[in-house]
Structures are given as structure tokens and as C-alpha cells.
């Protein structure tokens, strides 16, 4: 069977500005963000430390767009999985223009917020928020969506010891047949 190819982009970077969220006539949310990724290296000739930053346009749709608008801010670190798409549009003078961007939607799009609470505008500090673009992605069990509540500044929670499923002391191993 012939392969049709793979179109998958994975980015980990920081937002260059707050997300721009708008709503389509159908009511679906669309968020535009720009993500900066950087690499550093040492110039062999001069020994000087060099850095190169690449800017990526990312468009999120649906629930992901709403989450991005609510929780992401300039400087937030984020993990993105999506598809590379090029769209054609016309500027004010009628010239054809092209824009290439990472599109995050459908069953193959993922946004995970990284970093601590200070970066995420009140999100819990442990872990990120892994938000698949669509609940019940192919090949994954369906689970109810978790409600994320801000952490309260209270006494630390006490965790009980795990309970193991052990048979009672008088359990008889003899099989009755």
C-alpha cells in the first residue's frame, strides 16, 4: 500500500503575545498565537555563543481556542501538536499572499500548557493541562472531561496509604471441587 505521507508538527516554545480569540458565525472559537522557539550554539571560529529564534504562527480551533484564550499569556510555555497548512488570501491591493501556519484542531491536535503557576495565570503548578482537541480521540478510551479548579492556599492535603486488595486472614485456598 502506498503511503500518503505524514503532516505533523510538534513545537515547544513561549508565546510572543497574548492569544487573539474570536468567534466564527457558527459559534466556534478560533485563537491565533505566535510561539517562539530558540536554539543556541557556540560558533567554532570565534567561540561566541549564538542564538537563533524562530517564530511560528499557530491557529487553534474549538475548545482548545477557548482554553488558550483563558489561560495562556505572553511568555507562557506551551507544547503544541498540529498540522502545517498554507492558506492563500488577498491583501488590500488584490495581491495574492500566502501564510503558513500550524493548525491545531480535530482528533490529532494537542495543546499542553507547561511551566509553573506564575506563567499560567493561576493554573496549578504541578504538571500542565493536556487538552486534546476532541474528546474520545481515535484509539483512546472516552473519559469525562476533568474540571480544573485553581489551587486553594490551604493546609497541605494528607494522603492516605494505598489500600491493597488482600484476601481476609481466614481465606481458604482449597478449591471445593
Curated annotation (Swiss-Prot):
Keywords: DNA damage, DNA recombination, DNA repair, DNA replication, DNA-binding
GO biological process: DNA recombination; DNA repair; DNA replication
Motif (Important for interaction with partner proteins): 172-177
Domain SSB positions: 6-111
Database matches in CDD domains: SSB_OBF
GO cellular component: nucleoid
InterPro entries in alphabetical order: NA-bd_OB-fold (IPR012340), Primosome_PriB/ssb (IPR000424), ssDNA-bd (IPR011344)
Molecular function (Gene Ontology), one example: enzyme activator activity
Region (Disordered) location: 118-177
Bias (Low complexity) ranges: 118-129, 140-164
Self-association state and partner proteins as the record states: Homotetramer.
NCBIfam families: PRK09010.1, ssb
Function: Plays an important role in DNA replication, recombination and repair. Binds to ssDNA and to an array of partner proteins to recruit them to their sites of action during DNA metabolism.
Name assigned to this protein: Single-stranded DNA-binding protein
Source species of the chain: Vibrio cholerae serotype O1 (strain ATCC 39315 / El Tor Inaba N16961)
Lineage, uppermost ranks: Bacteria, Pseudomonadati, Pseudomonadota, Gammaproteobacteria, Vibrionales
Name of the encoding gene: ssb
